Each structure stands twice: as C-alpha cells, then as structure tokens.
C-alpha cells in the first residue's frame, strides 16, 4: 500500500486562500444598480414597498429577498475536520469552503457564520434568533454529543430546514458507497460485519443509517479512542454511543477489524496499520475517511 499525498504544499494552500483576494467568497448584486432609479428601488425609498409586504406576510420574503436561495453554514469550531477544537475563527476557511461548494455545484448562495460559544444553550439561542434570515441552515464541525442536541432542538424550533453535514452528509455518501461495494463484492448488507473507527457525529450517523438499511446491529462494532463500544462499558459513554453498544468480547480496533468485511474510518490519521487490514475478511471494503488525512 502507498500513502496518497496531496499534490500541493502548505505554502500553495495558503497562497490559494490569500491571493489575489483573501478568502473564497464575495457578494455579487442580482440587480444592475446602474442608475439613480436602480439605487432608489434597491434601497430607500423603493425598498419600503417589499418591507410593508413582508410585514403583512413573512413568507413573501421568499419572493422579494434572497432568502429562498440562501443557506447559512454555521460552526463554533469545536470539531474542525479531524483536527479537533481549534476555535470558531479557525473554522472560517472550512465554512467558506462549504459555501463555495454550495454555489459551485448547486448554485445555492451561502454565507459562513462562526459563533464564538461552546455553550449548547447559548449556541441554540443564537442560531434560533438569527436562523429565519436564511432559507436553510447547514451545521458543521460542532463537537459530539452537543451537535445532536443542537440539531434536534433547532429542527423543532425553526421553520426552515436544518442539516448537520458531519452526520447526514457523511452517512449518505458512506451508505451509498457501501451498497455499491457490496454489489461489486457479492455481499448482502444483512451479512456484512462492520468495524467503525470514530464514535463522533459522523461515525454514529453512519452506524445508524447502515443499520436502517439492513446491517445487523450486532454486526456493527464501533470504536472510539477508548476502544470498542460494548454493552456494560461506562468510560466515556453517552446516550448516543450507548445506542450502538453490543455484546462482544472484543475491546480494541485491532480486534474489531479482525474478520470484518467493512471498515468505516471516521477518526484520525494513522489509526489503521497494514496488519489490521490484512486481518480483515477477503476482498475487504475500506472507506478511510478521516479528514484531512485518512486512517491509512
């Protein structure tokens, strides 16, 4: 096996983000703004007309403003990529990056919002109070288990779509890949044994979706930095991990991968060795998805 390295240096990555204009986002008007009349319509006094209309019916914001095609990408920087809690400001390049992906591939306008708080209730309150500004919210890089609580509450309290990308985006892609890989290797989902490295938002969501698709609960061994999530374990457990605890004598990722058909990596670089891969079932399915560097 060879390790795939990026085709750029650190300096090139920094130059990309700083030149010729710092960052990756800008705002472009959708109206010509070429004459005094345009300016009077865009701002005062013309803007008062849609203001009054929206005051009568707030749903008209979808007709008279950019709300319907505008998503907020929101983070507090407590779980940036696989790098950990580096703070809200450090998350900004990632959030800008997600925003430009929305624009490039779906023509959805987006803005990054960094919230400088680690308090769950404060974060919920802040996002709830500004959330209706946009047509949807993409939560990103918020630590587990707080991210589950935040998403659940915001879905209940806001009248717009709320999507936690680290959970659902990762799970959807991983599940789709697993279905295809099983078809290619002649496996049935109900029969595969799965080892998952990483019990954060992405790992738990992947486990939940593949279980929903037909992988047996007892065939999913989830591991975190403490080891296998097994029934009776008390160290570093919470209600979300407990939902995936199984009866097993295995206690380490090495043991979990022994004989496994599938490995889903959502942890850190270097977590898996060649020997661990060799111990898996023949023709193993390996998704090493640690970010920014894979497990192997």
Question: PLM ranges: what are they?
Answer:
Residues 59-64, 127, 184-185, 209-212, ...:
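A generic local secondary-structure boundary/capping motif
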Residues 131, 189, 256-257, 277-280:
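A short, aliphatic-rich alpha-helical micro-motif
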Residues 72, 112-114, 136-138, 195-196, ...:
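Structured core elements
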Residues 138-141, 165, 264-296:
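ADP-ribose/adenylate-binding Rossmann-like module
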Residues 157-171, 288-291:
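Short, acidic/small-residue loops that bind anionic groups at enzyme active sites
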Residues 1-162:
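N-terminal ligand-binding/catalytic initiation module
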Residues 81, 86-106, 164, 172-264:
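Glycine-rich phosphate/diphosphate-binding loop of Rossmann-like nucleotide-binding domains
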Residues 159-160, 217-218, 281-285:
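A short helix->loop->beta-strand "cap" motif at the edges of active sites that frequently abuts
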């Amino acid at each position: 096996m060879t390790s795939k390295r990026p085709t750029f240096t650190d300096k090139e990555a920094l130059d990309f983000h700083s030149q010729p204009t710092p960052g990756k986002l800008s705002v472009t008007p959708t109206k010509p703004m070429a004459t005094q009349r345009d300016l009077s319509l865009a701002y005062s006094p013309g803007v008062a007309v849609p203001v009054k209309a929206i005051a009568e019916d707030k749903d008209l914001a979808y007709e008279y403003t950019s709300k319907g095609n505008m998503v907020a990408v929101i983070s507090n920087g407590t779980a940036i990529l696989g790098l950990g809690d580096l703070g809200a400001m450090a998350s900004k390049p990632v959030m800008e990056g997600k925003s430009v992906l929305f624009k490039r591939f779906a023509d959805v306008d987006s803005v990054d919002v960094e919230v400088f708080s680690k308090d769950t209730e404060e974060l919920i309150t802040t996002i709830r109070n500004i959330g209706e500004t946009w047509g949807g919210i993409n939560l990103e890089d918020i630590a587990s288990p707080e991210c589950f609580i935040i998403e659940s509450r915001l879905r209940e309290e806001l009248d717009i779509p709320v999507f936690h990308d680290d959970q659902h985006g990762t799970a959807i892609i991983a599940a789709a890949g697993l279905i295809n890989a099983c078809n290619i290797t002649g496996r049935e989902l109900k029969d595969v044994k799965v080892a998952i490295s990483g019990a954060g938002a992405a790992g738990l969501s992947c486990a939940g979706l593949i279980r929903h698709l037909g992988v047996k609960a007892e065939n999913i061994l989830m591991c975190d930095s403490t080891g296998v999530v097994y029934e009776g374990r008390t160290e570093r457990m919470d209600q979300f991990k407990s939902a995936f605890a199984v009866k097993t004598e295995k206690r380490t990722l090495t043991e979990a991968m022994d004989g496994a058909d599938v490995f889903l990596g959502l942890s850190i670089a270097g977590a898996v060795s060649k020997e661990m891969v060799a111990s898996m079932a023949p023709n193993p399915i390996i998704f090493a998805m640690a970010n920014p560097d894979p497990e192997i």
